[in-house]
């Protein structure tokens, strides 16, 4: 429940994504088409123009944004595995972020995408210091950021943001690079040439309010041919390590219990869960799509189209 990122704007580029308390939890989305960079998520960098958003669709397990200009169309999808009768999926701390780019003018176009997340997502307040690092398992590569202090389960009450565990960006897709640096540096580097800094910033620990240390990944989609959309996906996830203080006993989340259980009682790294989700993305996507259709059909039968829209909006809340 601590991993909370919402867009409160009609257009995804109008405002920073936020925690449910209203505090910024900034994610940045950029797309580069034929050497020109556009924003598709977040208001920064301000000197990078926003790609026109033409629609947003909220389904029970996913939100789909669509953008376009004269040359290309971009579809950005956030998929959370919120299927109530499958506890392995429902408890998953992983959200998929997927992109699809297609030509609109019958010409080929070079395209690449960028996803960034600041240290705000891993602290209660920006005066806390964070550290970062990398992990990998097989084809899966990941970069993470978390508070230096790691005050596990110490905070209580409303308006509380998680400041223990680690936020991850992960991908097993080809032509994907990662970096950790100030948010402005990451976005400006991608906007300039479609890449990321060659080395992670080594100035850590650092307070989040000191230049907004952040993570980013960038994927080169190559040449998008007319009639053949290019697609890729990444994962944003949170490893909270411990989820509940139950009568002075720290308990892990259900997903972690199941992960260790599948490892025959041996503690498994978080990258094992990320690798599983990378490999099973198509399976989960199809499962969630079927659930979405069934739930919307039931809600429509019960109360009509608007009732179904409200139900889809409320489902992940």
Region roles according to the model:
Residues 44-49, 76-82, 199-203:
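Short Pro/Gly-enriched beta-strand edge/turn motifs at strand-loop
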Residues 3-70, 157-188, 192:
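An extended acidic
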Residues 82-89, 100-317:
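Acidic/polar, glycine-enriched structural segments that form the non-catalytic walls/loops
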Residues 91-97:
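Short, solvent-exposed loop/turn segments enriched in Ser/Thr/Gly
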Residues 60-62, 94, 212-216:
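Short beta-strand-initiation
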Residues 68-89:
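Low-complexity, acidic Ser/Thr/Pro/Gly-rich terminal tails and inter-domain linkers that flank the onset
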């Amino acid at each position: 429940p601590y991993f909370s990122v919402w867009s409160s704007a009609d257009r995804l580029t109008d405002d920073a994504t936020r925690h449910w308390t209203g505090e910024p939890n900034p994610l940045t989305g950029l797309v580069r088409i034929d050497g020109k960079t556009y924003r598709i998520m977040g208001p920064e960098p301000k000197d990078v123009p926003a790609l026109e958003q033409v629609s947003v669709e909220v389904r029970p397990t996913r939100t789909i944004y669509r953008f376009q200009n004269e040359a290309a169309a971009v579809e950005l999808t956030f998929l959370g595995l919120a299927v109530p009768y499958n506890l392995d999926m429902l408890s998953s701390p992983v959200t998929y972020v997927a992109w699809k780019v297609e030509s609109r003018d019958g010409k080929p176009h070079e395209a690449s995408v960028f996803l960034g997340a600041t240290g705000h997502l891993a602290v209660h307040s920006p005066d806390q210091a964070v550290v970062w690092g990398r992990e990998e398992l097989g084809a899966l590569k990941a970069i993470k950021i978390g508070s230096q202090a790691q005050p596990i389960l110490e905070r209580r009450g409303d308006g509380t943001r998680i400041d223990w565990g680690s936020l991850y960006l992960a991908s097993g897709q080809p032509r994907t690079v990662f970096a950790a640096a100030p948010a402005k540096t990451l976005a400006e580097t991608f906007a300039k040439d479609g890449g990321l800094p060659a080395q992670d910033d080594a100035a850590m620990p650092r307070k989040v309010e000191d230049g907004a240390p952040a993570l980013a990944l960038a994927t080169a989609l190559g040449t998008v041919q007319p009639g053949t959309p290019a697609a890729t996906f990444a994962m944003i996830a949170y490893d909270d390590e411990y989820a509940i203080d139950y009568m002075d006993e720290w308990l892990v989340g259900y997903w972690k219990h199941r992960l260790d259980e599948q490892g025959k009682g041996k503690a498994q790294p978080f990258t094992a869960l990320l690798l599983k989700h990378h490999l099973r993305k198509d399976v989960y996507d199809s499962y969630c799509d079927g659930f979405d259709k069934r739930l919307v059909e039931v809600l429509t039968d019960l109360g009509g189209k608007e009732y179904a829209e409200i139900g889809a909006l409320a489902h992940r809340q």
